[in-house]
Amino acid sequence: MKQKLLILIVLLIGSTMCFAQPLVSYRFEERSLSLGGGYTNMLDTYLSPLKYQGAHVSVLGERFTQTQAESKRWFTQSLFYLHGDYATPRSGSGLTVSGMADYSYTSYYKVAAKGEQFRFYAGPQGQLRIGGIYNLRNSINPAQLKLGVNLAASAMIKYVFTGWHIPMNVRLQADLPLLGIAFGPNYGQSYYEIFYLGQGKGCVHMTALHNNLSLRSNFSYDIQLHPCTLRLTLANDLYQWTLGRQHYRMFSHSVMVGCVKDLYHVGREEEAKKSIPY
């Protein structure tokens, strides 16, 4: 009798789980990797009073995640942007190379959604930039370290549609730094004095809109193919500092091509695809 009762309980639990499967919650995640190149224009008065122009290559990795399985309003985004530049002045007598690594983490709230097509997101963003510039023309102080941390505001607009029976979407994202901290030597101050002699007072600066008016924007176009979604991105990055009497500005414009992969961490994939939260 007890064995029959146990079997009945197991069967009831199993049948309940089977019927409940379509209602199992899930957490959606989108990952992408893009490669590209374009044009750069930079000025760093610590190294040279001249403007340098040249080639720009970049790698962009993104992770866009739904924070909770039950929530369709809160999302997080992690962006890793690795880029390098090779530039010369207008005269052609000189060369500057640079390499930067940018990381940002954003907490997005879906402010508005019009049907299943239009979505608008906004939220705070933390930014970290580290890298360096090397001027082959200089014999004294040929290099410049770039290090900064920012609190920024980010906004994203996304429009989903179908063309030629293929799911597509366009997306525009813009990030504006508001407050931060940056490292930069003072006028005439060498890195030998800062790191070897320990005379680094005044090298850490507070930044805001008055001395760090920067903007990063990405316009992307996604075409859903198999086994992944094709992403075409137009990336623009305007970054400038005025620290003490030193001015730094870098503007880059690049075209990128990449692949997007959707992941479903919990629940059944076919059910999740029917109601992607963003």
Where are each of the predicted segments found?
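Short glycine/proline- and aromatic-enriched beta-strand/turn motifs that initiate or cap beta-hairpins
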Residues: A20-R73, I276-Y278
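Short loop/turn motifs that connect adjacent beta-strands in outer-membrane beta-barrel proteins
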Residues: P22-E29, Q66-F75, K110-F120, T162-N169, ...
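Residues that define the transmembrane beta-barrel architecture of outer-membrane proteins
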Residues: E29, K51-L60, S93-Y103, F118, ...
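Transmembrane beta-barrel strands of outer-membrane/channel proteins
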Residues: R31-N41, T76-G84, A122-G132, I157, ...
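Extracellular loop and loop/strand-boundary signature of outer-membrane beta-barrel proteins
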Residues: L43-Y52, D85-L95, N138-Q144, C203-T207, ...
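Residues on the lipid-exposed face of transmembrane beta-strands in outer-membrane beta-barrel proteins
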Residues: V59-Q68, A101-Y109, P124, L151-Y159, ...
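Outer-membrane beta-barrel transmembrane domain signature
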Residues: I140-P227
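Predominantly the C-terminal beta-signal and adjacent terminal strand-loop region
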Residues: Q173-D175, F183-P185, K201, H205, ...
